[in-house]
Amino acid sequence: MRKFSFSIILMAGLVLTGLLLSGCSKEPVNHTKGVYMLLDTSGTYALELKKAQNIINYLLGKLQPLDSFAVARIDSGSFSEKDIIHKVTFDSRPSMTTNQKRVFAQKVDDFIKGVKSSPYTDISGGMLQGVEWLDESKTGKRIILVFSDMEEELPEGHKRDFTIPFNNTHVVALNVTKLRSDIVDPREYMDRLSVWQAKVEAGGGSWEVINDLDNLQDILD
């Protein structure tokens, strides 16, 4: 009987040890969010930037300490850190985070007040710069927001016909306004979005379109 009891105790001890070891071996879950937002500044679309500013202010209200946020412009050659308007990783202290958000909002406001329209729209380059920034931020959830009509126009010589390594990045196209040609033939609009969806998914990302800006409540989930 004693031998039987000792065996039970030994087995229970081994099971408990195994559970403790397995619990210790699990890596902590990274709940931080990284958001990289691209603003189309080409042609008449620059007139839409006040809407983008409202979205940015909404996101600033939602993002938490240790989350990362960057806003960049889309112009003739967007694969460049020079196009980043402002970027930040929020401090762990709420009081510091509040001040960082205030500075961020002011930087964006200054940019929009003085923005100059770009003749070209290098969306792919902006996305690639966003992926690079998200890689460096090492956040748990990766989001690229593209405020644009999604009509890419590249300067002569720029090459963008390659797969972008989105690597589990969720890409959201916002406020995709319809061009005059889209109104004449709606298939152009649908085809344009389908091409972008295929490009994102080919690189291991996920794709979403939000045109009704009242539906932003789940954008960070």
Ranges and model annotations:
Residues 150-195:
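VWA/integrin I-like adhesion module and closely mimicked acidic/polar interface patches used
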Residues 1-11:
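Bacterial N-terminal signal peptides that target proteins for export
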Residues 31-141, 143-145, 177-180, 213-217:
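Von Willebrand factor
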Residues 20-23:
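C-terminal motif of bacterial Sec signal peptides marking the signal peptidase cleavage site
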Residues 33, 118-168:
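Exposed acidic/Ser/Thr-rich ligand/metal-binding surfaces
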Residues 25-27:
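Bacterial signal peptide processing site
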Residues 189-221:
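C-terminal helix of von Willebrand factor
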